[in-house]
Amino acid sequence: MRLEQGDFSRETRFGDDPVSVARGFVAAGATGFHVVDLDGARSGEPRQLATVRAIASAVGDRAYVESGGGLRSPEAIAAAFAAGASRVVLGTAVLQDPSFARQAVETHGAARVTVALDVRDGQAVGEGWRERAPGREVSGAIEILAGMGVKTFEVTAIDRDGLRGGPDLRLLRSVLGTGRSVIASGGVASVDDVLALRDIGCVGAILGRALYEGDLLLADVVRALER
C-alpha cells in the first residue's frame, strides 16, 4: 500500500500478498526491502511484525529487510529485529526524544539504525506525518541526531511522496552537505531519477509507486546501476 504525500485518506492498495510481491522483486534483482508498518505509525506500536517476519523468511539471505513504523520503545525495536529485520527505521520517537536514538545505536550499532526525516516545508515531522515537531528544522535535527551517533538518514520529501514527480534534489543536497549518509525517498519515478540520486552522493533510494504501477522496472534500474 502507498500513500500520497503522507495522507492516510489518499491510500492506494497494490495487493494483499506482500510476501509474493517481495519474492517477485528479489527475482528482478532487489537486494533490500523497506517495510513500513502504517498501522504502527498511527498507533505508536508495531502492528505488522508477522508480515516483517514472513518477508524476511521468504527472501532469506538474498535481500535485507528494514522495518519502520511504530518503533517507539526499546522493546519494539527488539521485536523488529527478532522478527527478522536487519535494520530499523526510527522517526517520531527520536524527534520527540533524541536520546532514544543514542540508546538504539549503543544497543544495536549504528549500521542497524536509520533515522527517517520526513520533511515538509523544511521541517522534520512525526506522528505518521500528521504533526510538525517544534524546533526541528532539518539541519538542526540532523545535528542533534548525529550527536547521538546516527550515521544514516532516510530523507523523504513529503510533497513528492507517491506522486512520481522526481526527487527533491535541492533538499537532498542540503542534507548531504552535512556529511551524513542519505537514503532518498519520495518522487523517484525513473531510471534517470535513480542515477541522479547516485550522482549527488545518496547511498540508496526507496522505490515505491512507480514500481507497483509498472512505470519503472526494477530490472532496468539494476542494469543501469551496474553499467
Task: Set out the residue ranges of the language-model regions.
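Conserved beta-strand positions in the central sheet of alpha/beta enzyme cores
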Residues: 34-37, 66, 89-90, 114, ...
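Catalytic cores of alpha/beta
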Residues: 59, 63-88, 170-207
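Active-site-adjacent beta->alpha loops and helix N-cap segments on the catalytic face
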Residues: 40-57, 71-78, 92-114, 160-176, ...
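Short, acidic/polar
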Residues: 14-26, 73-78, 133-144, 194
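N-terminal beta-alpha supersecondary unit
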Residues: 1-46
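Conserved anion-binding
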Residues: 1-11, 78-81, 85-161
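Active-site-adjacent loop and "lid" segments of alpha/beta metabolic enzymes
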Residues: 4, 10, 121-135, 163-165, ...
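Conserved, mostly hydrophobic/aromatic
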Residues: 25, 33, 80, 115, ...
